């Protein structure tokens, strides 16, 4: 979907809602009328993330993050050398897999959703999933994530994972009819994300998304 400034209810009525950010920062925290991972036109949602078919990655941390074959989240990035940043990047990807697993399963209660998110990050995930459910949509196609960077806090327990996302080939699909809501390529296909990942105090190597910031119509990602 593409970015709109309408209230969520109105955006849904127009079938063009898109969720942006939860949390404070440079991006507007209240700018939450965009559904991640879908192209947004007059009929459909539009935006999202890595190939989900890698068997070895289906159950990281014992959590099932597998997705349907037609829901392909691609994370086209290289792991950083620092161990904590590499782990945070992996779980930032799992955070997005969890969101779209929730979309597919039609629930915010799936373990993949709750394992990789906390605080504002969990609120963001729940809002995303509920927007898709309320709209009667699931997702299909390929959502590509790329040009990732990482930055660690001095204490080593917080990492910012930033990246671009291209949802030009990722579409909404009506659950009842199976109709794919195609959209034309546009600047609205490109988003720039900053995810604040924090290390779980008891989970061995587990990182959770605590805040999500999104710059929509991101020309630098084109």
Give the ranges of each region predicted by the language model:
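Structured, amphipathic secondary-structure segments that form assembly/contact surfaces
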Residues: 108-109, 114-222
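Bacterial N-terminal signal peptides that target proteins for export
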Residues: 1-10
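Post-signal peptide N-terminal segment of mature Sec-exported envelope proteins
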Residues: 32-59
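Core segments of small alpha/beta cavity-forming domains
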Residues: 61-139
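C-terminal motif of bacterial Sec signal peptides marking the signal peptidase cleavage site
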Residues: 18-21
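Active-site-proximal loop/hinge segments that shape catalytic or ion-binding/gating pockets
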Residues: 15
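Bacterial signal peptide processing site
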Residues: 23-26
């Amino acid at each position: 979907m593409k970015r709109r400034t309408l209230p969520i209810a109105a955006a849904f009525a127009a079938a063009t809602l898109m969720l942006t950010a939860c949390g404070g920062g440079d991006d507007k925290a209240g700018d939450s009328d965009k559904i991640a991972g879908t192209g947004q036109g007059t009929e459909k949602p539009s935006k999202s993330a890595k190939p989900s078919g890698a068997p070895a990655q289906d159950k990281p941390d014992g959590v099932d993050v597998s997705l349907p074959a037609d829901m392909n989240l691609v994370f086209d990035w290289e792991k950083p050398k620092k161990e904590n940043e590499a782990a945070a990047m992996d779980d930032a990807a799992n955070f997005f897999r969890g969101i779209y697993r929730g979309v597919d399963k039609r629930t915010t209660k799936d373990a993949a959703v709750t394992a990789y998110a906390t605080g504002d990050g969990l609120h963001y995930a729940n809002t995303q999933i509920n927007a898709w459910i309320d709209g009667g949509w699931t997702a299909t196609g390929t959502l590509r994530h790329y040009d990732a960077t990482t930055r660690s806090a001095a204490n080593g327990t917080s990492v910012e994972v930033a990246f671009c996302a291209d949802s030009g080939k990722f579409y909404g699909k009506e659950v009842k009819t199976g109709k794919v809501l195609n959209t034309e390529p546009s600047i609205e296909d490109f988003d720039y994300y900053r995810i604040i990942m924090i290390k779980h105090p008891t989970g061995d190597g587990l990182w959770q998304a605590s805040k999500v910031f999104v710059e929509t119509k991101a020309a630098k990602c084109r």
